[in-house]
């Protein structure tokens, strides 16, 4: 034994192993891979940390199946031993977080022998944590896309939800424990902004989704009516609201709640609004479409059951019934939900495209009379129900059209209109003609927040387009660069009707709220632009960048600055190499310096420079520093 041990010490293995965790969204399962070809002498001599970069690039390509930008790599060593079995939970907790509290950042010039003992690495612990930008397969919001996948994701999500929702009982699914389970599964999740967390406190599944109005624009009319001080309630509604206000404050046990409040409320609502749905009840006069679904309880979360959640599942189950299948396969099933707990009511809108999305259209309104001064209270309540009636009338007209609409049948591997936003035409700025188009796919199909789509015109010679949806967009900066051929040609930027361009319509414009830290207010807009055949700088290995990349990006940024604009988001995905040229895309944050602000929710590990922070003004110096950070001169 002693001889064997001696020989091992005299002739150690020529290579050292290094267990490496690449902390990035592209490593979705947070796997730890091992660098096995690192020369042992590299760890025992004065080799520097930055010499690990080629090994990381190779490991990413062969072990993780993606490429990384070596210039963006950062190396960390966990401060406390991190077992391989605990790596996934640790990664979930610290993804997109500042690691310095839990790991030591290794300076590039630091000697490896001062960091690692070759006899202690490559065991049952994570030795190295690496941050860096991936060059492909990144779940980023992009304005360029690849080919349509073999399996069409939207159909699979729709079909999985259709199969699994049959197994649910809404009253049970709305209780917290069951709800948490369902919000962790792609096949049962409702995208309403409520989410479950894993044991480590990380979000189990993203439930933020696209605005429902891009699938059904009239939803916007309801929220606009409620926000408009000039929106007047129908006079014929005052008697109805007076009756509701008298009964809304009743405190009752479940046994007599139906007789004292729920039934009278339903009677007056149906008198004014027409047939409605409640949990466990279907109206019947031929094919009844659930325009408005109502769920009323003694109180919100009474009995551990949330009436909003119960109504969500009830709407989904109703639309999943066989008799509604022909209609369901033609559209995104827009529906109104009125949920109440005691005297408190809230109005929501729901759509079922590829995902089931529910979003609020109103604040919570209390209908109980608490003051002797009641006129203003009745007026506000009347406006609330008048807005609901407005929404129901819009839905009736919509479904009348859908029922007679001719449409291709739903197929598993074919893009279908029901999965995509409603707008399919726009008035072109250049030709002044109305151009129709069809959607091909989302640029990031896995991302529930995706607002960028690849489309194709319906012309004798079809051409591809990028169709984007955003309330905030720097159309002036985009147009300036498009005119100089430094950005995609801009065909339309305006309201979802495809006719109200910001160049001609004041309603299509938005603004930043004064004194509110740059919070933006404005309508949802559709932006239609040229599709560029190319790859962005994140998808392209740095050695394949055009030699003029830095000069072109700098000249483009200088042109914006000279005109008083800032770009705001000069990261790798927003620079496109196409047709031998370098162009900028994604002008969501662009605008006049001093007028535009960084938005909510900036990721700390997205490669920002100092001074970039949510709700702070975007400055020209930020653009220039981002230029040197991400597009340095060679």
Where are these regions (language model features)?
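Conserved structural core of kinase catalytic domains
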Residues: 470, 479-550
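ATP-binding glycine-rich loop module of kinase domains
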Residues: 427-488
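C-lobe/activation-segment region of protein kinase-like
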Residues: 546-547, 578-634
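A short, conserved, highly charged catalytic patch centered on acidic carboxylates
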Residues: 212-329
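Catalytic-loop of the protein kinase fold
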Residues: 561-578, 584
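Juxta-kinase regulatory segment immediately upstream of eukaryotic protein kinase catalytic domains
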Residues: 378-442
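Charged, often low-complexity linker/regulatory segments
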Residues: 140-264, 379-382, 386, 390-407
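Nucleic-acid nuclease catalytic cores
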Residues: 304, 316-362, 579
């Amino acid at each position: 034994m002693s001889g064997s041990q001696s020989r091992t010490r005299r002739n150690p293995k020529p290579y050292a192993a290094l267990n490496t965790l690449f902390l990035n969204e592209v490593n979705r399962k947070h796997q730890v891979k091992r660098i096995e070809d690192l020369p042992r002498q590299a760890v025992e001599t004065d080799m520097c940390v930055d010499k690990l970069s080629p090994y990381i690039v190779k490991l990413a390509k062969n072990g993780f199946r993606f490429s990384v930008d070596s210039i963006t790599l950062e190396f960390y060593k966990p401060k406390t031993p991190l077992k391989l079995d605990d790596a996934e939970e640790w990664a979930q907790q610290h993804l997109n977080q500042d690691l310095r509290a839990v790991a030591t950042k290794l300076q590039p010039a630091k000697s490896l022998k001062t960091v690692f003992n070759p006899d202690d690495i490559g065991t049952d612990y994570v030795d190295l944590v690496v941050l860096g930008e991936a060059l492909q397969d990144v779940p980023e919001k992009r304005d360029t896309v690849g080919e349509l996948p073999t399996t069409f994701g939207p159909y699979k999500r729709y079909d999985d939800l259709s199969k699994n929702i049959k197994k649910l009982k809404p009253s049970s699914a709305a209780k917290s424990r069951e709800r948490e389970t369902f919000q962790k599964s792609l096949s049962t999740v409702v995208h309403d902004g409520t989410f479950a967390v894993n044991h480590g406190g990380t979000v189990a599944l993203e439930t933020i989704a696209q605005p429902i109005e891009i699938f059904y624009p009239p939803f916007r009319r309801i929220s606009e009516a409620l926000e408009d001080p000039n929106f007047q309630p129908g006079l014929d509604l005052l008697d109805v609201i007076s009756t509701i206000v008298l009964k809304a404050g009743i405190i009752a046990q479940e046994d007599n709640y139906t007789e004292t409040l729920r039934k009278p409320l339903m009677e007056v609502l149906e008198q004014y609004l027409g047939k409605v749905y409640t949990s466990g009840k279907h109206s019947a006069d031929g094919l009844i479409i659930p325009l408005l679904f109502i769920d009323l309880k003694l109180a919100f979360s009474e009995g551990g059951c949330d009436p909003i959640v119960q109504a969500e599942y009830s709407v989904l189950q109703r639309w999943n019934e066989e008799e509604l299948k022909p209609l369901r396969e033609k559209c995104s099933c827009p529906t109104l939900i009125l949920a109440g707990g005691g005297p408190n009511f809230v109005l929501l809108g729901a759509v079922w495209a590829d995902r089931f999305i529910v979003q609020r259209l109103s604040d919570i309104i209390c209908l109980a009379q608490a003051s002797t001064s009641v006129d203003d209270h009745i007026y506000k309540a009347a406006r609330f129900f008048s807005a609901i009636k407005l929404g129901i009338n819009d839905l009736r007209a919509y479904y009348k059209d859908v029922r007679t609409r001719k449409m291709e049948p739903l197929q598993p591997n074919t893009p279908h209109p029901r999965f995509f936003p409603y707008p399919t035409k726009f008035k072109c700025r250049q030709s002044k003609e109305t151009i129709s188009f069809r959607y091909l796919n989302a640029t990031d199909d896995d991302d529930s927040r995706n607002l960028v789509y690849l489309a194709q015109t319906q012309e004798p010679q079809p051409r591809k387009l990028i169709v984007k949806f955003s309330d905030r967009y720097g159309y002036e900066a985009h147009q300036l660069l498009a005119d100089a051929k430094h950005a995609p040609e801009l065909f339309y930027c305006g309201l979802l009707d495809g006719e109200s361009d910001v160049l001609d319509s004041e309603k299509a414009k938005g603004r930043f709220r004064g004194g509110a830290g740059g919070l933006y207010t404005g309508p949802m807009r559709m932006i239609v632009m040229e599709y560029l055949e190319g790859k962005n700088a994140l998808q392209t290995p740095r050695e394949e960048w055009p030699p003029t990349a830095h000069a072109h990006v700098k000249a483009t940024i200088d042109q914006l600055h000279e005109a008083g604009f800032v770009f705001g988001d000069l990261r790798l995905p927003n620079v496109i190499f196409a047709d031998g040229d370098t162009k900028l895309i994604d002008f969501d944050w662009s605008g006049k310096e001093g007028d535009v602000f960084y938005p909510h929710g900036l990721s700390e590990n997205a490669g920002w420079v100092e001074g970039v922070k949510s709700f702070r003004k975007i400055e020209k110096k930020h653009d220039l520093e981002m230029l040197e950070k991400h597009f340095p001169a060679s």
